[in-house]
Regions:
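Flexible helix-coil linker/hinge segments at domain or subdomain boundaries
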Residues: 93-98, 213-223, 252-267, 311-315, ...
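Long hydrophobic segments that form regular secondary structure
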Residues: 289-312, 319-347, 486-490, 496-499, ...
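Gly-rich Lys/Arg/Thr-decorated short loops/hinges at beta-loop-alpha junctions or inter-strand turns
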Residues: 24-33, 187-192, 307-317
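Single conserved hydrophobic/aromatic residue that forms the stacking wall/gate
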Residues: 2-9, 13
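Short amphipathic beta-strand starts and helix->beta connectors
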Residues: 14-20, 47-58, 181, 213-216, ...
Length: 528
């Protein structure tokens, strides 16, 4: 408790201690990042977050792009009390920053998705237990992020992580994992490489251990901009890196890190299904006709569930005029109440900065929608242009070159017509305030990056990024734009898409078919 009151929190030792406990010193105040393992929370935990926002912050909390929760205005001397309150509901801020193994992320619909191959949550928990306080990997060359997908669709963006894992079955039906290494965004964006097409599940932790040992031994420590594992994999080549991992496996295979059926079952028991009722699917024809707003919301903000009679619901945190991913303390309390009444007391956060109620009875969906409208959670824009991923940017972050939130708001206001928004269809728009890419701009169908030009804020636009299966990095459109021009620029890009698209084509599909030139010509023709 005395440490926050002491000076020198920027000293090497104290800085490492501070960061590995999730505490940043930002532009105007400290920021505390709270760990939310694989995005799962219960109602009591959410109420505690609401209390912290109310008592120690300015009444807000923020969902990050790694499914964590951030408080942007705590006083430094209050941090020990905040951590103590978090501990009462089994929460902490350990390893949410620093050069260590960070929070393992996954699909926000894990365990309920209709297209799921294997529930990834037990594997996320196994990895979490292995990584937390791991003494060998507490001071890596640079931060390290792992994502695990469990479904046919990749909703965990595994191809742009330091390690990405996805379950597969061999010809005999045995479970294993495809293992990807060397992905990442930031200053040097890279789509990772698969180095193992079938890793037996028993060897999962041993293989991760081997990867980390190779990285810890050969990763650069002389230049933090060249220290991520993606730089090492590229320098060695994926093939040579894989050989070094296999050399480590000679010492690890069959050892103490080998997983057993008993251990996997022990962890899996914490992820049993709730007490689902035997329900039939609901025919919404009459309700949709009577309530067009409900029909519109249902088409965008719900997803098929593995159990008949249930549905997963996404609560949009992207209404016009609200910073993407922000919730007030009152909204947090309301979400906790909704989770208890509609979803067995649990909810999830997503890397798209929204909230999910994963187990809603279809017969209660209309009643839930009415409550979500009252709480400001029913904007029917999930997967659409205004469902913007956005970092806090220059309004908060000391690293940012430019503000992000005002850009998001200007675009939301320009595209506030729901009819037009639905006509445009699915599109990912991501905004980062600097090259660290916390807003994942590299993998947005449209990406926006804040840059500094002689002390003025400008914005660079990229097109063609994609975080899903077969990930791709966006291509820079051309010279950057002033803040006041950004909504016009996006409008011109959308106009090209609408003119050029064929039936059922998404923005990314049209871009991949016609290339960047038509977009570039339209945007810059009016500026020169």
């Amino acid at each position: 408790r005395d440490q926050p009151r002491s000076r020198g929190l920027g000293d090497v030792y104290k800085r490492q201690l501070r960061l590995q406990n999730g505490l940043y010193i930002q532009r105007f105040a400290p920021m505390l990042r709270v760990a939310v393992p694989y995005g799962q929370l219960n109602a009591n935990q959410v109420r505690t977050l609401a209390k912290i926002a109310r008592d120690y912050d300015k009444g807000y909390a923020h969902i990050s792009t790694r499914q964590n929760v951030q408080f942007n205005w705590p006083a430094l001397e209050d941090i020990p009390d905040i951590l103590a309150e978090l501990a009462t509901v089994q929460m902490h801020a350990i390893q949410t920053s620093g050069n260590c193994l960070r929070n393992t992320t996954t699909d926000q619909f894990a365990g309920v998705a209709a297209d799921e191959i294997v529930d990834p949550r037990p594997w996320c928990e196994i990895v979490r237990q292995w990584t937390t306080f791991h003494p060998e990997f507490a001071y890596l060359p640079r931060k390290f992020k792992i994502a695990i997908n469990g479904s046919q669709e990749d909703r965990a963006a595994i191809e742009v992580h330091d390690i990405g894992l996805e379950p597969v079955r061999n010809a005999a039906g045995e479970l294993g994992f495809r293992v990807l290494v060397g992905g990442g965004l930031g200053r040097t964006p890279v789509v990772g490489s698969f180095i193992n097409e079938f890793l037996p599940w028993q060897d999962l932790i041993s293989y991760l251990d081997a990867i980390l040992r190779v990285y810890n031994r050969y990763g650069r420590r002389d230049n933090k901009y060249k220290a991520r594992i993606k730089i090492l994999v590229k320098a060695l080549t994926p093939e040579v890196f894989a050989e070094k991992v296999e050399a480590e496996m000679v010492h690890l295979r069959g050892g103490t890190t080998t997983l057993t059926e008993a251990e996997v079952q022990r962890v899996s028991r914490h992820f049993v299904d709730p007490e689902y009722l035997a329900l039939d699917n609901v025919d919404y024809t009459a309700l949709d006709a009577e309530h067009p707003g409900f029909a519109r919301w249902r088409s965008r903000n719900t997803r098929a569930h593995k159990r008949p009679g249930y549905v997963a619901v996404t609560l949009s945190l992207k209404p016009t005029g609200v910073a993407p991913g922000d919730l007030t303390d009152k909204q947090l309390d309301a979400v906790a109440d909704l989770a208890e009444r509609y979803s067995f007391g649990f909810l999830r956060t997503s890397h798209e900065q929204n909230i999910i109620l994963a187990d809603v009875e279809q017969r209660q969906l209309h009643a839930l929608w009415l409550e979500l409208r009252e709480g400001g959670f029913a904007t029917p824009n999930i997967g659409l242009l205004t469902d913007i991923i956005c970092c806090p940017g220059g309004d908060y972050c000391s690293l940012a070159n430019a503000k992000s939130i005002p850009i998001a708001e200007s675009i939301q206001r320009r595209f506030d017509d729901l009819d037009y928004l639905f006509d445009i269809g699915e599109i990912d728009l991501n905004i980062s305030g600097c090259m660290n890419a916390c807003g994942h701009h590299h993998v947005g169908h449209i990406g926006i990056l804040g840059v500094d030009k002689k002390g003025e804020e400008f914005y660079q636009v990229s097109l063609g990024g994609n975080a899903a299966r077969g990930a791709s990095l966006g291509k820079i459109l051309g010279p950057s734009f002033a803040q006041d021009d950004m909504a016009d620029v996006i409008e011109k890009l959308i106009a090209v898409y609408v003119e050029q698209r064929t039936e059922e084509e998404r923005f990314i599909d049209t871009y991949q078919r016609i290339g960047i030139d038509p977009f570039k010509e339209r945007v810059y023709a009016a500026n020169h």
